[in-house]
UniProtKB/Swiss-Prot annotation:
Ranges where the PAN domain occurs: 374-455
Domain of life: Eukaryota
Primary residence: secreted
Name under which the protein is recorded: EP1-like glycoprotein 2
Sugar-bearing residue positions: N56, N106, N191, N211, N241, N289, N446
Residue ranges constituting the Bulb-type lectin domain according to the UniProt record: 44-163
GO cellular component, one term: mitochondrion
An annotated Gene Ontology molecular function: carbohydrate binding
Keywords linked to the UniProt accession: Cell wall, Disulfide bond, Glycoprotein, Lectin, S-nitrosylation, Secreted, Signal
Cellular compartment(s): Secreted; Secreted, Cell wall
InterPro entries noted in UniProt: Bulb-type_lectin_dom, Bulb-type_lectin_dom_sf, SLSG/EP1
Positions bearing S-nitrosocysteine: C374
Length: 455
């Protein structure tokens, strides 16, 4: 036999052995069907849910469990839930596999010998998968920290849910500039598909955006804070002595590299970092074991952390951090705080701005509706009504707009822009900000801050 033939035979033998090694053993394979009775306990979003059960595999690692749930009939999401059945408090959904591609009745979740975890409709159409076929997967596991993993024979992760966050970060989970770098909100409690709010990590910082018009607008976050490419939601113990922790700290930690620029914490409408040791942001300090916590970008654009308080007898989930908090009187900075439209002062929606002035606010308050929001048609003029002492939610993050410029030039830009619903003008600094979205208008004690709203 020639040397070439020997080499080819040897390569084929090695490949054959590799394929055998890469297979999931029969006792670790599973195929489960979305069918049967719904669970009886209260869950977030008022969702109906079904347990996933297999003789070969456990889908529960306390307090985390993988299930199917729906908020609309016959549209199921494969999701991870946190909470215990004996608790009276609502159990929470903290990871979705197929939020934009729900499945129907009798859908299947399967892990075959090739190591690919597949969610498919009853007719076989694949709706979601891990794309891990023939990559050495030998098993499936839900870890005690809520990370769902597919691992190889050495325990190394081939795929993990921590690399694919949706709207939530669990303790120890990260966003990465060179990976999945954002959280995206749900559309609503009843609609789990991608919503208009996002929190994005880039080389400049961690920034919150709202996009309802095709133009992303910044409304929160830490846009000038250097996280060095990775930000991790963490909970650490603070010790008063060598043995007993006195408190637990909720943190946003940057990548573990030396020296960081503390960033520009200019008058942002948010909670400011409590200290900045090595670039770490201290969100809050709690006096109980907050190891089971999560950070959630809500469907309303809010950013909140919740911590599980095991000693409580009722309502064991506690809101342990809020970016738009009542404590810092920053609720008015949330674009959706007053619904579609409203005038907000000190955490209260006090008025509904109209061409007739500031009227009483209700959840029916809305900006003027018209199809002619620009002066592109010959002879067409655009009308505005004026609100004195008001600020747009994005103003603090864009240095109040562009300028210096005159109020007439600012108006002319909004006149010509069909997407512009109004403009905000800083008379003292001669700054101009065009607004394609209005939402919650924030009272400004400075009467030289004026809004002009189209109608």
């Amino acid at each position: 036999m020639s040397r070439f033939a020997i080499l080819v035979t040897l390569a084929l033998a090695i490949a054959t052995v590799s394929v055998v090694i890469a297979q999931v053993p029969p006792e670790k394979q599973f195929r489960v069907v979305n069918e049967g009775e719904f669970g009886e306990y209260i869950t977030e979003y008022d969702a109906s849910y079904r347990f996933i059960e297999s003789s070969n595999q456990s889908f529960f690692t306390s307090p985390f469990q993988l299930l199917f749930y729906n908020t609309t009939p016959s549209a199921y999401i494969l999701a991870l839930r946190v909470g215990l059945r004996r608790d009276e408090s609502t159990m929470r959904w903290i990871w979705d596999a197929n939020r934009n591609n729900p499945v129907g009745e009798n859908a299947t979740l399967s892990l075959g010998r090739n190591g690919n975890l597949v969610l498919a409709e009853a007719d076989g159409r694949v709706k979601w998968q891990t794309n891990t076929a023939n990559k050495g997967v030998t098993g499936f596991q839900i870890l005690p920290n809520g990370n769902i993993v597919l691992h190889d024979k050495n325990g190394k992760f081939v795929w993990q849910s921590f690399d694919h966050p949706t709207d939530t970060l669990l303790t120890g989970q990260s966003l990465k500039v060179n990976g999945v770098n954002k959280l995206v909100s749900r559309t609503s409690d009843s609609n789990g598909s991608d919503g208009p709010y996002s929190m994005v990590l880039d080389k400049k910082g961690l920034t919150m955006y709202v996009n309802k018009t095709g133009t992303p607008l910044v409304y929160g976050g830490w846009p000038d804070h250097d996280f060095r490419g990775t930000v991790t939601f963490a909970v650490t113990r603070e010790f008063d002595n060598l043995t007993e922790p006195s408190a637990y700290e909720l943190l946003l930690e940057p990548a573990p590299q030396p020296a960081t620029n503390p960033g520009n914490n200019r008058r942002l409408l948010q909670v400011r970092p409590i200290g900045s040791g090595g670039g770490t942001l201290n969100l809050n300090k709690i006096n109980y074991n907050g190891t089971i916590s999560y950070l959630r970008l809500g469907s309303d654009g809010s950013l909140k952390a919740y911590s599980y308080f095991p000693a409580a007898t009722y309502l064991k989930w506690e809101e342990s951090f809020s970016f738009f908090s009542t404590y810092f009187v920053r609720q008015c900075g949330l674009p959706s705080f007053c619904g579609d439209y409203g005038y907000c002062d000190r955490g209260m929606c006090n008025a509904c701005p109209t061409p007739k002035g500031l009227l009483g606010w209700s959840d029916k308050c809305a900006p003027p509706k018209t199809t002619q929001f620009c002066s592109g048609v010959k002879g067409k003029t655009v009308n505005y009504y004026k609100i004195v002492g008001v600020e747009h939610f994005t103003g603090p993050y864009v240095n109040d707009g562009q300028g210096p410029t005159s109020v007439n030039d600012c108006k002319a830009k909004c006149d010509r822009d069909c997407k512009c619903l109004g403009y905000f003008y800083k008379e003292k600094d001669k700054k101009c900000l065009l607004a394609p979205l209005l939402g919650t208008l924030i009272k400004d004690a400075n009467t030289s801050s004026v809004a002009y709203i189209k109608y």
